[in-house]
Amino acid sequence: MGAASHPPVPLLNPAAPNAQVLDRLWSTILARKAADPLVSHSARLLSRGVNKVAQKFGEESVECLIEAVAGNRTALIAESADVLYHLLVMWVAAGVRPEDVWLELQRREGISGITEKASRPMLLSIAETRKIP
């Protein structure tokens, strides 16, 4: 049964901030790219290049995983915000716009995850991966 056959689950608080906050955050990060790295955390991260930004994203992701496994909901929420922020910094560093990702998510909507994953070409084998210096 595909995702399209399930009714949407209503939000508990529809007035709460939504995914548009990610678009605004991305715009802020993009604007700060040209800022002084001594004044802006985003500018400092971006000045280090995509490899270091990706490494920082990985570190934040692991912290998020640890809190999920530990069952610490409050810390998981905080770490999730960190992960989303660092993901957006990585997008800016790599030249990815949010709408690129939203379009890909829209393309996948209603397709079984197993079917969608099987349709992807093998982009990188495990043997080709390398540690970021």
From Swiss-Prot:
Family: Belongs to the PRA-PH family.
Species for this entry: Acidiphilium cryptum (strain JF-5)
Keyword annotations from UniProtKB, A to Z: Amino-acid biosynthesis, ATP-binding, Cytoplasm, Histidine biosynthesis, Hydrolase, Nucleotide-binding
Recorded metabolic or biological pathway in which this protein acts: Amino-acid biosynthesis; L-histidine biosynthesis; L-histidine from 5-phospho-alpha-D-ribose 1-diphosphate: step 2/9
CDD domains: NTP-PPase_HisIE_like (cd11534)
A GO BP entry: L-histidine biosynthetic process
Catalysis performed (reactions): 1-(5-phospho-beta-D-ribosyl)-ATP + H2O = 1-(5-phospho-beta-D-ribosyl)-5'-AMP + diphosphate + H(+)
Keyword Amino-acid biosynthesis: yes
Location(s) in or outside the cell: Cytoplasm
Keyword Acyltransferase listed: no
Protein name: Phosphoribosyl-ATP pyrophosphatase
Lineage: Bacteria, Pseudomonadati, Pseudomonadota, Alphaproteobacteria, Acetobacterales
Enzyme class, spelled out: hydrolase
Entry GO terms, CC: cytoplasm
